[in-house]
C-alpha cells in the first residue's frame, strides 16, 4: 500500500472567498489561463496550419502538426522529470514560457512553411511543463489552497483552453483566412 499524503487537513483549505482575496492565487490563475490558451491554440490549429502551409492532405496535416506537437510536449515532461533535481521548476517554466513566445513567432512569421511547422512542434516542447509545473508551484505558493484552489485553477486553465483556439479562429477569420495572423 502506498499512502496518499494530503497537503491540507480536511476542512483546513482556504475558502473560495479567501482565494479570491489572495494575489498569489490570481497570479496562478493567470498562469493557468495562459498555459491553457497557448497549449490548445497551437494544438487545435496545428493540423489546419500544416495543411494550408505545406499544402498537404488532411491525413498528412494531422500527422505532421498535432503528432509533432504532442510528441515534443511529452518529451518536455520527460526531460523535466529526468533533470528536475538539476533545474529548478521556476527557471524551467520561465525558459519554457520564453520558448513558447519564440515558437509562436516562428510559426506566425517563419518565411518557410517547414520552419513555421517546426515552430508548431517547438510550441509543444515549450508548453509541456506549464500546466503541471503551475500546479506544483501553486501548491508551494498557496499551501493552504486545498481542493477549491485546484478546482478553480483547473477551471482557469480550461477557460484558457477554450479561449485560445477561439481567439485564433476569430483573428484568422478577421484576417480573411490568415492563420498566421491568428497565431
Task: Give, region by region, the residue ranges found by the protein language model.
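Paired small-residue
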Residues: 103, 114-122
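Intracellular juxtamembrane helix-capping segments at the cytosolic ends
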Residues: 128-142
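Juxtamembrane intracellular "pre-TM" segments in multi-pass secondary transporters
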Residues: 2-28
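Transmembrane alpha-helical cores of Major Facilitator Superfamily
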Residues: 33, 67-71, 98, 151-159
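A late C-terminal transmembrane helix in Major Facilitator Superfamily
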Residues: 144-177
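Structural signature of the two symmetry-related core transmembrane helices
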Residues: 91-106
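Interfacial helix-cap and linker-helix signal at transmembrane-aqueous boundaries
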Residues: 50-51, 83-84, 139, 168-177
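Extracytoplasmic gate region of multi-pass secondary transporters
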Residues: 22-67, 71-74
Amino acid at each position: 500500500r502506498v499512502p496518499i499524503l494530503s497537503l491540507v487537513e480536511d476542512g483546513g483549505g482556504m475558502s473560495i472567498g479567501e482565494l479570491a482575496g489572495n494575489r498569489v492565487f490570481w497570479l496562478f490563475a493567470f498562469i493557468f489561463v495562459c498555459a491553457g490558451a497557448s497549449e490548445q491554440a497551437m494544438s487545435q490549429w496545428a493540423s489546419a496550419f500544416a495543411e494550408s502551409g505545406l499544402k498537404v492532405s488532411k491525413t498528412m496535416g494531422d500527422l505532421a502538426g498535432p503528432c509533432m506537437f504532442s510528441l515534443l510536449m511529452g518529451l518536455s515532461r520527460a526531460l523535466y522529470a529526468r533533470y528536475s533535481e538539476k533545474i529548478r521548476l521556476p527557471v524551467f517554466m520561465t525558459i519554457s514560457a520564453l520558448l513558447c513566445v519564440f515558437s509562436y513567432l516562428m510559426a506566425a512569421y517563419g518565411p518557410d512553411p517547414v520552419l513555421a511547422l517546426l515552430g508548431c512542434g517547438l510550441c509543444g516542447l515549450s508548453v509541456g511543463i506549464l500546466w503541471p509545473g503551475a500546479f506544483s508551484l501553486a501548491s508551494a505558493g498557496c499551501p493552504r489552497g486545498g481542493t477549491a484552489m485546484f478546482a478553480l485553477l483547473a477551471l482557469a486553465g480550461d477557460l484558457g483552453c477554450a479561449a485560445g483556439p477561439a481567439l485564433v479562429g476569430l483573428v484568422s477569420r478577421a484576417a480573411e483566412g490568415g492563420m498566421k495572423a491568428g497565431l
